[in-house]
Amino acid sequence: MGTGEKTLKSFQLHRKQSVKVKDVPKGCLAIKVGSQGEEQQRFIVPVLYFNHPLFMQLLKEAEDEYGFDQKGTITIPCHVEEFRYVQALIDGERSVYNGNNHHHRHGGRDQYHHLVGCFRA
């Protein structure tokens, strides 16, 4: 079991089901995104995101901010525009990977070290 799976299971064990199941497609999860003082927005993300290094960093920041006892929907404490940027990076990698261009994926987790601090307000 990878780190992302452990994090996801921990969040699931400590949160209530506040989102209607029919509202979220199979294989996806609803989250809230927004930093302090910013209106939070709801996003539906594929569960595959939870194994991506960038998304794991966002989950780590959520853990640091709220702990594992946050109630309801998982909340990611970053600016919505920064989350959209991360989402575009993840989706771009997934489209390259799904397009059988496996040789274009380089670096693993280390390729994101320059982005680690960009999520903090």
Curated annotation (Swiss-Prot):
Keywords from the UniProt entry:
Auxin signaling pathway, Cytoplasm, Developmental protein, Growth regulation, Nucleus
Q: Which Pfam families match?
A: Auxin_inducible (PF02519)
Q: According to the lineage, what is the superkingdom?
A: Eukaryota
InterPro entries per the record? SAUR_fam
Also noted in the record is:
Seedlings over-expressing SAUR32 display reduced hypocotyl elongation and are defective in apical hook maintenance when grown in the dark.
The family assignment reads: Belongs to the ARG7 family.
Record-given protein name: Auxin-responsive protein SAUR32
What is the species of this protein? Arabidopsis thaliana
Give the lineage: Eukaryota, Viridiplantae, Streptophyta, Embryophyta, Tracheophyta
**Which gene is annotated as encoding this protein in its UniProt record?**
SAUR32
